[in-house]
Amino acid sequence: MESFLFTSESVNEGHPDKLCDQVSDAILDACLEQDPESKVACETCTKTNMVMVFGEITTKATVNYEKIVRDTCRGIGFTSPDVGLDADHCKVLVNIEQQSPDIAQGVHGHLSKKPEEIGAGDQGHMFGYATDETPELMPLTHVLATKLGAKLTEVRKNNTCPWLRPDGKTQVTVEYRNEGGAMVPVRVHTVLISTQHDETVTNEQIAKDLKEHVIKPVIPAQYMDDDTIFHLNPSGRFVIGGPHGDAGLTGRKIIIDTYGGWGAHGGGAFSGKDPTKVDRSGAYVVRQAAKSVVASGLARRCIVQVSYAIGVPEPLSVFVDTYKTGKIPDKDILALIKKNFDFRPGMIAINLDLKRGGNFRYQKTAAYGHFGRDDADFTWETVKILKPKA
């Protein structure tokens, strides 16, 4: 049977774009914690010695934006200029305005509408995806790239590899077989890690530590063989990193946030957006729908699309494709999805408890992926068992 190669990448929490996602979601958490009806569209950008938050926020919450920025950067590990940013001494710029009253009246009638009447915060289309190739019902390439990034951060923070610095990227290539539309991983073909490091460490030490402390604990032995290729800091030097190395911006890592290039993406980013923004809530509910189809044994692989018009509660369209892996026809699966899931934004927020912030609820989503996580706060990962009519 013919095989093919597919690749997914990830970046860890010290990457400048991911720093921005985490700041935006930390601000969302702070607003929702005090005022669950907060309307938040918060962007962040960063460059050497500077973090700026800007956007539209309407909330009754009292939020110290500067403190949130500094706390988030410090928590990631940006505590001195030589690691890429100094959380306590960098410039913090804030340019936050209120949500446009035009949007407010169209979406939630200035809070006068019932939940089922709340319109979508914008137009757009979102995709949810699931596959039976991993226990998380996520693509293996994406799962491994993401877990390598998380492990890099873990061994940095617990001092297993004290030479590590916060910024880093991973990439995994897997050889697959196509089994009647289902994706079956055969082996890991290539592992790539580029991580920021201090001045003292040699490239030999970097490669040895990454294999021992990052790759070996993450990638199951069954997928590795003598032909697996490793590229470990292939550029030869990565001392300058974080915002000092590259500018960062919220919403620049939308494939890493989702399915690693599998499925499809409507283009809307997640971080810094409250649940009336269907870019986020719509994508969460279609992940739940696709995952439920696969977990219920109705298909081995599934993609679901939903689309919206601004101010209109009901979705314009819902689409499903099981890549010819469905146990029943796709049209019957679509009927089950429509019966079991409410795609109106106000109802998604209630059913998935999306107005609850605080406790790093959204900030956690902003690094290492929004899907396939085993965490009670990720309510959209809860499966509904779908039963076709006998």
UniProtKB/Swiss-Prot annotation:
List all disulphide bridges recorded for this chain: none
Q: In which pathway does it act?
A: Amino-acid biosynthesis; S-adenosyl-L-methionine biosynthesis; S-adenosyl-L-methionine from L-methionine: step 1/1
| Cofactor note (record) | Binds 2 divalent ions per subunit. The metal ions interact primarily with the substrate. Can utilize magnesium, manganese or cobalt (in vitro). Binds 1 potassium ion per subunit. The potassium ion interacts primarily with the substrate.
Chain residues that bind K(+): 43
Sorted alphabetically, which InterPro entries does this protein's record hold? ADOMET_SYNTHASE_CS, S-AdoMet_synt_C, S-AdoMet_synt_central, S-AdoMet_synt_N, S-AdoMet_synthetase, S-AdoMet_synthetase_sfam
Pfam families, per database record: S-AdoMet_synt_C, S-AdoMet_synt_M, S-AdoMet_synt_N
Instruction: Enumerate the residues binding Mg(2+).
Output: 9
One Gene Ontology biological process: S-adenosylmethionine biosynthetic process
Role according to the record: Catalyzes the formation of S-adenosylmethionine from methionine and ATP. The reaction comprises two steps that are both catalyzed by the same enzyme: formation of S-adenosylmethionine (AdoMet) and triphosphate, and subsequent hydrolysis of the triphosphate.
Provide the protein name.
Answer: S-adenosylmethionine synthase 2
The species this protein belongs to is Actinidia chinensis var. chinensis
Q: What is the lineage of its organism?
A: Eukaryota, Viridiplantae, Streptophyta, Embryophyta, Tracheophyta
